[in-house]
Swiss-Prot record:
<dbReference type="InterPro" id="IPR002201">
    <property type="entry name" value="Glyco_trans_9"/>
</dbReference>
<feature type="binding site">
    <location>
        <position position="192"/>
    </location>
    <ligand>
        <name>ADP-L-glycero-beta-D-manno-heptose</name>
    </ligand>
</feature>
<comment type="function">
    <text>Glycosyltransferase involved in the biosynthesis of the core oligosaccharide region of lipopolysaccharide (LPS). Catalyzes the addition of the first heptose unit to one 3-deoxy-D-manno-octulosonic acid (Kdo) residue of the Kdo2-lipid A module. The analog ADP-mannose can serve as an alternative donor in place of ADP-L-glycero-D-manno-heptose for the glycosylation of Kdo2-lipid A. Displays no activity with ADP-glucose, GDP-mannose, UDP-glucose or UDP-galactose.</text>
</comment>
<dbReference type="InterPro" id="IPR051199">
    <property type="entry name" value="LPS_LOS_Heptosyltrfase"/>
</dbReference>
<keyword id="KW-0328">Glycosyltransferase</keyword>
<feature type="binding site">
    <location>
        <position position="261"/>
    </location>
    <ligand>
        <name>ADP-L-glycero-beta-D-manno-heptose</name>
    </ligand>
</feature>
<dbReference type="Pfam" id="PF01075">
    <property type="entry name" value="Glyco_transf_9"/>
</dbReference>
<keyword id="KW-1003">Cell membrane</keyword>
<keyword id="KW-0997">Cell inner membrane</keyword>
<keyword id="KW-0808">Transferase</keyword>
<comment type="similarity">
    <text>Belongs to the glycosyltransferase 9 family.</text>
</comment>
<dbReference type="GO" id="GO:0008920">
    <property type="term" value="F:lipopolysaccharide heptosyltransferase activity"/>
</dbReference>
<keyword id="KW-0472">Membrane</keyword>
<dbReference type="GO" id="GO:0005829">
    <property type="term" value="C:cytosol"/>
</dbReference>
<dbReference type="GO" id="GO:0009244">
    <property type="term" value="P:lipopolysaccharide core region biosynthetic process"/>
</dbReference>
<comment type="pathway">
    <text>Bacterial outer membrane biogenesis; LPS core biosynthesis.</text>
</comment>
<feature type="binding site">
    <location>
        <position position="188"/>
    </location>
    <ligand>
        <name>ADP-L-glycero-beta-D-manno-heptose</name>
    </ligand>
</feature>
Length: 319
């Protein structure tokens, strides 16, 4: 059986889809998946053993110059790649009009998705042949697991979902695996940042632990923040710029991780690493870290200024 997945973004949403593949792989021997995903996240599906082909899409980039000759050529090549296979099922796990119209509609196969009442954007359901009612008040991982089970005709397991990507990195862990922590300090929204003075206080509190701390970054302003956090601490390392796979390898070898609400926090969960995620205004209930050893540290009054380093240290002691 060959199935196409349409789940293009974001990083957390893409990662939250992986346990559904594991369920299907266990329920339907020999099943294989192709996966349409935004080019920036194209490495992620390849880490799962059930994925045979990754089809990158670049809607975010294309829309800036949709009708230019180079972009038209890219869109044509994408359409040809998408339509090269006749699928037993096409599962749109994105639930948005944009992806349904520009991707799902063009694929060959019976199209499954959430119904008008439960899709993220109800109009997206008009593009599906089979519409499934998936209750909203459950974690995003469980919603996707239920969608796959109903689309492919098996019962959703009652056990916790398994991302099944940690093993991809086990044969290539860093030589110092287990000897360091990773602090994920960067996120997209200002109100989801933990103040730098709190990060530095936590780093100072770990001075006698013997653990080294690694700080990844993606953009130049994040590198500058990492340097400020590391200043004066010999046991803190600002990492070089890395690919997503490179960062995943570092996370896979971490003894533990402390993170803000960011896509890399979900990657940590997918890699089964102990993780404390600090939350301010966002509610982790339905979209927070899902997996083994994932702990939430909520800020008083939903403001991360009010979350001190001692509270995070106390959580660390319980990992």
């Amino acid at each position: 059986m060959r199935v196409l997945i349409v789940k293009t973004s974001s990083m957390g949403d893409v990662l939250h889809t992986l346990p559904a593949l594991t369920d299907a792989q266990q329920a339907i021997p020999g099943i294989k998946f192709d996966w349409v995903v935004e080019e920036g996240f194209a490495q992620i599906p390849s880490w799962h053993a059930a994925v045979e082909r990754v089809i990158p899409v670049a809607i975010r980039r294309w829309r800036k110059a949709w009708f230019s000759a180079p972009i038209k050529a890219e869109r044509k090549a994408f359409r040809e790649a998408l339509q090269a296979e006749n699928y037993d099922a096409v599962i749109d796990a994105q639930g948005l009009v944009k992806s349904a119209a520009l991707v799902t509609r063009l694929a060959h196969g019976v199209k499954h998705g959430m119904d008008w009442q439960t899709a993220r954007e109800p109009l997206a359901s008009l593009f599906y042949n089979r519409k499934h009612h998936i209750a909203k008040q459950q974690h995003a991982v469980e919603r996707t697991r239920e969608l796959f089970a109903k689309s492919l005709g098996y019962s959703k397991p009652q056990t916790q979902g398994d991302y099944a990507i940690a093993q991809h990195f086990l044969t290539n862990l860093p030589t110092d695996a287990g000897e360091y922590a990773v602090f994920l300090h960067a996120t997209t929204r200002d109100d989801k940042h933990w103040p730098e003075e709190h990060w530095r206080e936590l780093i100072g509190l770990l001075a006698d632990s013997g653990i080294r701390i690694k700080l990844p970054w993606g953009a130049p302003h994040e590198e500058e923040r990492a340097k400020r956090l590391a200043e004066g601490f010999a046991y803190v390392e600002v990492l070089p710029k890395m690919s997503l796979e490179g960062v995943a390898r570092v996370l896979a070898g971490a003894k533990f991780v402390v993170s803000v609400d960011t896509g890399l926090s979900h990657l940590t969960a997918a890699l089964d690493r102990p993780n404390i995620t600090v939350y301010g205004p966002t509610d982790p209930g339905l979209i927070g870290g899902y997996g083994k050893n994932q702990m939430v540290c909520r800020a008083p009054r939903e403001n991360l200024i009010n979350l001190n380093s001692q509270a995070v240290l106390e959580k660390l002691s319980s990992l």
